[in-house]
Swiss-Prot record:
Family, similarity comment: Belongs to the FAM181 family.
UniProt biased composition (Low complexity): 128-141
InterPro entries, sorted: FAM181 (IPR029359), TEADIR3_omega_loop (IPR053819)
PANTHER family for this protein: PROTEIN FAM181B (PTHR33766:SF2)
Region (Disordered): 106-157, 226-246
Residue ranges of the TM segments: none
Protein name: Protein FAM181B
Amino acid sequence: MAVQAALLSTHPFVPFGFGGSPDGLGGAFGALDKGCCFEDDETGAPAGALLSGAEGGDVREATRDLLSFIDSASSNIKLALDKPGKSKRKVNHRKYLQKQIKRCSGLMGAAPPGPPSPSAADTPAKRPLAAPSAPTVAAPAHGKAAPRREASQAAAAASLQSRSLAALFDSLRHVPGGAEPAGGEVAAPAAGLGGAGTGGAGGDVAGPAGATAIPGARKVPLRARNLPPSFFTEPSRAGGGGCGPSGPDVSLGDLEKGAEAVEFFELLGPDYGAGTEAAVLLAAEPLDVFPAGASVLRGPPELEPGLFEPPPAVVGNLLYPEPWSVPGCSPTKKSPLTAPRGGLTLNEPLSPLYPAAADSPGGEDGRGHLASFAPFFPDCALPPPPPPHQVSYDYSAGYSRTAYSSLWRSDGVWEGAPGEEGAHRD
């Protein structure tokens, strides 16, 4: 109707609420200036003449397109608002929530033991009983039984997993299930826990015996096995005597409050109590600084320095004496050590590290070296001390006359230095 009105009218703006004649249009815009909306000719032609001359096919076509666009847009908007959109994904929220509730209740182990859940073993046994009564519906029933069987298998697997988790984290509650293997399994952990609660050696033996007595039982849960207490918690040293709950030094804050804490204390007491054999041995035997194999290499206790004493005599910033200050030792000679002036023996303490000036005249400390290191060579006897101003070359093979035989003449005169031609052999 709007398009027809636009075609019949003489002005394109008439269908939008104006009158059907140019006079009505002019009356509506009479208050406006003629130059504000329409451009006049130089000759001053009125606006009505321009409007009447502008009527043509272009204006009518544009008006028709505009009105058809508005009509289609309004209809599309109305349909979009009224028509409900289809969901691309269908979710059965009731079934999903039921699954979640069943799974959570199975994990928590709060469900009381009831009839055994249907499994894949009993579903084929039920189907042949119903097949003779309705043989004509056998094919459709078989087609519908496949998803039901898969659902029952999934439910059985979920119930088995929930039961195993409940048995793992709850040792005092029985494993739910009315089957005979489950009953045997419940009896075995009960016997193991009862024996372990005594705290003696009988509990350690009764646990495995009760677990292995039933051949048809399933795998024993981890908490029901006879495992040492150190498997679950880190062991700590005992704080007091006795094998009761107050024996081990374990705080109740680290464990659960209730029967499990008491059971843990009773299990931990015999192993880590202070009255056990290991604790008595540790308290009675002192700590040996040296290992057992090193006792063979040790000498008499008089010759060994103290544990925290300084090292032995260090003469001239050397731990070991010079080669010419140690006499050659004879392995067959074993005589008590006698010092001419020091008076040192094996059972007496060492003399001062640096002897007085009277003991070593002329700055020669040959005898002082021997006196300082005498206890470390018990098999060697000290030779008589040399004269004050004469050095002996017999202390070592490296400085003997045989090594420097070319410097001695046949008459025993030294040929070494120019000022020592008259020196005779000693």
